Amino acid sequence: PGTNFPIELIYVKKHLVIEVVDAFDNWYKVLDEEGNTGWLHKSLVSSRRYFVVKNDSAKLYKNPKNNIELLFLETGLRGKIESCRNDWCKVKIKKYSGWLQKIDIWGVYQNENF
């Protein structure tokens, strides 16, 4: 990684969902939701967590303990992850807040809690 190498890809999406797979000095090797890998300077990477919906059947629920559905979500929709526990993540999508099942999103490991 470094500034002396050619640029292979330019990201223009806001709140890009990436996985950091390696690190070297001030650089992170990242994997994006489409399977692309490359190096990003750490100043371009935020600790805020975001997700992208990967299943057409994804639903936003009021809470994980009941079946009150708030929204049906389209594949590719993005939002912010506030916390995750067990099989669920508390998320925010624009003005909506609720819970999503981890299996419906890309951006969090299935065994990850925070």
Residue ranges of predicted features:
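Boundary regions of SH3-family modules and the immediately adjacent low-complexity/disordered segments
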Residues: 1-25, 31-68, 72, 78-80, ...
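Helix-loop-beta junctions that constitute the ligand-sensing/allosteric loops
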Residues: 86-88
